[in-house]
Amino acid sequence: MAAPEAWRARSCWFCEVAAATTMEATSREAAPAKSSASGPNAPPALFELCGRAVSAHMGVLESGVWALPGPILQSILPLLNIYYLERIEETALKKGLSTQAIWRRLWDELMKTRPSSLESVTCWRAKFMEAFFSHVLRGTIDVSSDRRLCDQRFSPLLHSSRHVRQLTICNMLQGATELVAEPNRRVLETLASSLHTLKFRHLLFSDVAAQQSLRQLLHQLIHHGAVSQVSLYSWPVPESALFILILTMSAGFWQPGPGGPPCRLCGEASRGRAPSRDEGSLLLGSRRPRRDAAERCAAALMASRRKSEAKQMPRAAPAARVTRRSTQESLTAGGTDLKRELHPPATSHEAPGTKRSPSAPAATSSASSSTSSYKRAPASSAPQPKPLKRFKRAAGKKGARTRQGPGAESEDLYDFVFIVAGEKEDGEEMEIGEVACGALDGSDPSCLGLPALEASQRFRSISTLELFTVPLSTEAALTLCRLLSSWVSLESLTLSFNGLGSNIFRLLDSLRALSGQAGCRLRALHLSDLFSPLPILELTRAIVRALPLLRVLSIRVDHPSQRDNPGVPGNAGPPSHIIGDEEIPENCLEQLEMGFPRGAQPAPLLCSVLKASGSLQQLSLDSATFASPQDFGLVLQTLKEYNLALKRLSFHDMNLADCQSEVLFLLQNLTLQEITFSFCRLFEKRPAQFLPEMVAAMKGNSTLKGLRLPGNRLGNAGLLALADVFSEDSSSSLCQLDISSNCIKPDGLLEFAKRLERWGRGAFGHLRLFQNWLDQDAVTAREAIRRLRATCHVVSDSWDSSQAFADYVSTM
């Protein structure tokens, strides 16, 4: 005991000395007038002065501070800057101290934003450090403006990087260049191991240097890192080259930029293990031709971008219309030099001492001999997609320009990212910059000297891809579809409001091809759009047929189907193999969510999907309309007979006022555990007769655990009727009840609470009361909630009921 006592004495002596020194310095600067110790201008307390002195000299005293007793350390923690506060976290936990309140206060004072009410923050330290990293990277915070953020001994980016799980890149790729710079090499290495999600928001057009930095960043974070999810948000006018770069890198393809330093990690990996030819063919899809059209198209873009970046000048939009024959002749004339440009020596992008893998020469030779193989390939060896619409020249480029010289072909190649397939004769004109999915005459485009992606290196790829409000042009949609066909590592795909149009058929074909790949992991698909060329139920049937191993399917179409005009070339309607009438095979769906447009839906089509989904556990129908209550009853009967594993059923924004017998049928189902009727107008007709029948059905159901009734105009009378579900003679095991937005007043809620107390059923779980009229009598509402909290967990809000005036008038 002598040692701890001695240390405690020394620590107290140190505190007194530091405090005395600080007070002496303070007294010299202070006014000579004395102030009361309790006044507003009183000097800081002794312990606070001591803490300030200690925090100012943490570089020397850090180890000693860590050894301080818990009570002393607890007073010093709020005075530390963020770097030492982060470093002392483990020691504080061992002493039974928590820093969460300090980090929360730092968030409120420095970040000055309020987290979303839907967000549950489990660690304020990690949240603060992640946000701090992003602000420093973008230059939106000045670390010198606050002593808690400034310390010359620490790098803000490096110190906070290990807490970053999600990184957002915005606008003109701000931050990408800084992260790949040599001074931040350790920062990038730390991010590669900590970062899981990479997001792009509101991207704008960027220069060549920024895109080259992005290429290196994606290579490090995805190919050599732990990033498993890439999400793109709100990109109204996507830049095709940048979008396809992000896609191809996310899919695992890599071609280093010209003149860039060799990748050290690539060199280490190649020395450790060389990929086999079998592995490469598996990743690229062994069931498809070795030179898949999409891979060739994406490789064309990547190769041409490398050529453009080597010249460090922006792409010039073509202004000449050339014939197919002149295009082929010009490209063939410069084929030898072009191949040399597109295939730089290995030393330009491999680490010194790296041995070439056995598969590398084969891949290179296959690409370099593409011209001769094209001549031998039959015209039917590649699929023949329909011609796609042309794109206009870039603004500001007028007149025709004849390109000559050995470098002219490569400038044209930038715009020949995709070559229109299926044109008739050599004399037809095509505009450079036109996009398509095949080669000339639908054959191999290697006659243009473009390498297949087999010549690119293949690395790890992401497992989750999300595109929110990113309109997909034809070439972008085509590239996505063809990459998807071999993206076996992809587990979840979200396409939300991308304007796919008729490209949905290509998407279905690519998903079908992906499903046939060995090792396909796609288990979740979320698809939503304003319009669809297929009715939503036909689209659902097609997806389920294409992906029988899918577990989660969420599909939503906001407006009725508008089939494309058959008179327009390329829009001749859906292929027969997509909308076939054959029976849907058994699938593995466990969760199905459907959002319907206006108009009655054919119940037999929905029933056919449900019959094939015997493993379905959760079904959600949003805005579904049926021709008659009998059709709705047919759907419910199908659920009872074929979906025995169904546990959760949800209906939202559906008029079920005339389907009361069907609702009672559901409440008597002894397999369902949770039912949701959200804004379904349940009690609009015959409430006096229907409510007792509904309560009786629920009292006899012992398996139902949750009932959600938001937005059904339940009112006080309906709430008091529901209270009978918890009476002594009830066998109900209901433990979650949602009665939000139901015109409930404080007096009705108080009577409901008293009935629960009288029956003494004990705590039954959660009660949600959002957006009810509880502000009309705040005292009564507080008393009701106090009583309810003795019975259940109550979740409510302070809502202005005057917003519900229209709803009130409708119930008068």
Swiss-Prot record:
Pathway: Protein modification; protein ubiquitination. SUPFAM superfamilies: RNI-like. The modification Phosphothreonine is found at T327. InterPro entries: Leu_rpt_41 (IPR026137), LRR_dom_sf (IPR032675). The modification Phosphoserine is found at S155, S276, S326, S357, S373. Residues 268-408 are annotated as: Disordered. Keywords: Leucine-rich repeat, Phosphoprotein, Repeat, Ubl conjugation pathway. It comes from the Eukaryota. Residues 387-401 have a biased composition (Basic residues). GO terms for cellular component: cytoplasm; nucleus. LRR repeats lie at residues 487-507, 518-530, 531-555, 613-635, 636-659, 701-728, 731-752. Residues 45-54 are annotated as: Interaction with Elongin BC complex. Disulfide bonds: none annotated. Residues 354-381 have a biased composition (Low complexity). Signal peptide: none annotated. One of its GO terms (biological process) is protein ubiquitination. Probable substrate recognition component of an ECS (Elongin BC-CUL2/5-SOCS-box protein) E3 ubiquitin ligase complex which mediates the ubiquitination and subsequent proteasomal degradation of target proteins. Part of an E3 ubiquitin-protein ligase complex with Elongin BC (ELOB and ELOC), RBX1 and CUL5. Component of a probable ECS(LRRC41) complex which contains CUL5, RNF7/RBX2, Elongin BC and LRRC41. Interacts with CUL5, RNF7, ELOB and ELOC. The Elongin BC complex binding domain is also known as BC-box with the consensus [APST]-L-x(3)-C-x(3)-[AILV]. This is Leucine-rich repeat-containing protein 41. It comes from Pongo abelii. The lineage of its organism: Eukaryota, Metazoa, Chordata, Craniata, Vertebrata. The gene is LRRC41.
